[in-house]
From Swiss-Prot:
The keyword Transport applies. Belongs to the cucumovirus movement protein family. This is Movement protein. One of its GO terms (cellular component) is host cell plasmodesma. Transports viral genome to neighboring plant cells directly through plasmosdesmata, without any budding. The movement protein allows efficient cell to cell propagation, by bypassing the host cell wall barrier. Acts by forming a tubular structure at the host plasmodesmata, enlarging it enough to allow free passage of virion capsids. It is found in: Host cell junction, Host plasmodesma. It comes from the Viruses. InterPro entries: MPV. Keywords: Host cell junction, Transport, Viral movement protein. It comes from Cucumber mosaic virus (strain Ixora) (CMV). One of its GO terms (biological process) is transport of virus in host, cell to cell.
């Protein structure tokens, strides 16, 4: 079945053979291995003095090229509506320190577009975490879908950039960053609208949880939920609601959307990543 011009997903727009071809490109043993080795998906990345700046694309270069070729061939044949887009709902980074709180240093983490030669943060989504702020959970939300194209000799896609500053007397690992995301590829791009700031509850990790009575855990959870309005858990920064037709699960609890036309829905509004301390 050729492309029908509807807003359905790519796998519904194309034939089973075409869908299988795309699945093989994304989930072949080689592609999965490169997602781990080149992108550090779900792996702990150690920040050392000899690795002070890390740029990790969300799609391996080889996989990017094959997916782009797949969409281009479908577009040239008139079967697909575009040459392909990459959609990422959210990038979640768990950051933990591996030195004492007395160490003087910080990490600067942001989301960038490899199509930007300067690698500037997307819509100023950038956060600086001092060593004493860790551990922390950082959430980035791209505000647009990335076209599957090449810019010069660069394969364009989103990337997580991590910079290590300070830690003068520490040459070894001072922090560990574990990033997770889910990339989707489609011949149609999504629309993104602004909503009010959301709230996230993160309970401290209890190493003695197995030896704690269930009733005590239940009381702790109930107490935290009752105090959710406390400033410790309020994320005051604006976030992006992604009205994409996908089945991905929402990790952040969102409040109702802002009324269109209000001052808070202005495009000039600064977007910032959400940070939660106390993992």
């Amino acid at each position: 079945m050729a492309f029908q011009g509807t807003s359905r997903t790519l796998t519904q727009q194309s034939s089973a053979a075409t869908s299988d071809e795309l699945q093989k490109l994304l989930f072949s043993p080689e592609a999965i291995k490169k997602m781990a080795t080149e992108c550090d998906l779900g792996r702990h990345h150690w920040m050392r003095a000899d690795n002070a700046i890390s740029v990790r694309p969300l799609v391996p270069e080889v996989t990017h090229g094959r997916i782009a070729s797949f969409f281009k061939s479908g577009y040239d044949a008139g079967e697909l509506s575009s040459k392909g887009y990459m959609s990422v709902t959210q990038v979640l980074c768990a950051v933990t320190r591996t030195v004492s709180t007395d160490a003087e240093g910080s990490l600067r983490i942001y989301l960038a577009d490899l199509g930007d030669k300067e690698l500037s943060p997307i819509d100023r989504q950038c956060v600086t975490l001092h060593n004493h702020d860790l551990p922390a959970l950082v959430s980035f939300q791209p505000t647009y879908d990335c076209p599957m194209e090449s810019v010069g000799n660069r394969k364009r896609c989103f990337a997580v950039v991590i910079e290590r500053h300070g830690y003068i007397e520490y040459t070894g690992t001072t922090a560990s960053v574990c990033s997770n995301w889910q990339a989707r590829f489609s011949s149609k791009n999504n629309n993104y609208t602004h909503i009010a700031a959301g709230k996230t509850l993160v309970l401290p990790f209890n190493r003695l949880a197995e030896q704690t009575k269930p009733s005590a855990v239940a009381r702790l959870l109930k107490s935290q939920l009752n105090n959710i309005e406390s400033s410790q858990y309020v994320l005051t920064d604006a976030k992006i609601n992604q009205n994409a037709r996908s089945e991905s699960e929402e990790i952040i609890v969102e409040s109702p959307p802002i009324v269109i036309g209000s001052s808070s829905a202005s495009r000039s509004e600064a977007f910032r990543p959400q940070v939660v301390n106390g993992l």
